[in-house]
Design a protein with these regions (language model features):
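N-terminal secretory signal peptides that target proteins for export/translocation
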Residues: 1-28
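Short, linear, compositionally biased motifs with a strong N-terminal bias
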Residues: 10, 37-38
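Function-determining sites in protein domains
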Residues: 47-252
Length: 252
């Protein structure tokens, strides 16, 4: 028979104490609800900040990164570069050559990780990384204003990167590495397949548009992105500490 509620001296209802099993079930349910709500809240904002540059403990991944840096001549870029790593298509890199005011797009015709990381032995990959994959290369001369606005956007995204930022990676998808001064010290941050509405997603959209315009030689369309670049820069700047004024971009 169901137990009647007990009335205390204040005429308030008190219910019989739950058994241990009931308590555990209740706690588990509350925990599940809390986790679901936390995931919803996290997913809503996690991709608004990038993740600091990756550090590889795995030899194969270190070899892959070395292969990409060599293949795309990233060490020769100055000001900034964005390395794009799709899981199943050819990797590509958008970089800036300050001496000639050129945006340079180099796109591998095959996925270097698949061609070198899986097909060939690891020691071969490390000795001769990425040399067998053909590439297409394009360049577009841009204004100092566009170059400077891109440099500041990269700096803002990188300086506000956080270990509690975007998901670092997953199965499938695309990884974007944003780098400052890769020729010298390479400050960097990454994001992985960000949603379009997030700060990272909007920064990635700018990179993809620029890749398209460099490939098609559309200088006017590229220059018209300055306003959008400034807007996205300000989105990242919202994460600056109170009172912080970003005057330098740590670039050479």
């Amino acid at each position: 028979m169901e137990q009647e509620p007990i009335l205390n001296e204040h005429n308030k209802q008190e219910y019989p104490p739950m058994h241990t099993a009931e308590k555990k079930t209740s706690l588990i349910r509350r925990g599940i609800v809390f986790l679901l709500l936390s995931l919803i809240a996290t997913n809503a904002s996690a991709q608004d900040r990038m993740f600091p540059s990756k550090v590889y403990a795995n030899e194969a991944l270190r070899g892959y990164e070395t292969a990409l840096f060599d293949y795309f001549n990233i060490s020769k870029a100055n000001k900034f570069a964005c390395l794009v790593e799709p899981s199943y298509h050819g990797e590509y890199c958008l970089s800036y050559n300050q001496r000639d005011n050129l945006l340079i797009l180099k796109r591998a015709k095959k996925n270097i990780w698949s061609e070198q990381g899986w097909t060939y032995p690891l020691d071969s990959q490390l000795r001769n990384p990425g040399k067998k994959v053909d590439a297409e290369e394009y360049s577009l001369r841009i204004s100092d204003s566009l170059a400077d606005s891109l440099q500041v956007m990269f700096a803002s995204a990188i300086l506000t990167s956080s270990l509690i930022g975007d998901t670092l990676g997953g199965l499938g998808g695309v990884t974007y590495q944003f780098m400052l001064s890769p020729r010298y010290s390479s400050w960097g941050a990454v994001c992985w397949s960000p949603k379009e509405s997030t700060n990272c997603g909007q920064a990635v959209a700018i990179i993809e548009k620029l890749c398209k315009y460099v490939e098609t030689g559309d200088k006017e369309a590229a220059e018209n992105l300055i306003g959008e670049i400034v807007r996205v820069t300000n989105l990242f700047r919202q994460y600056y500490p109170a009172g912080y004024r970003h005057e330098k971009t740590f670039c050479i």
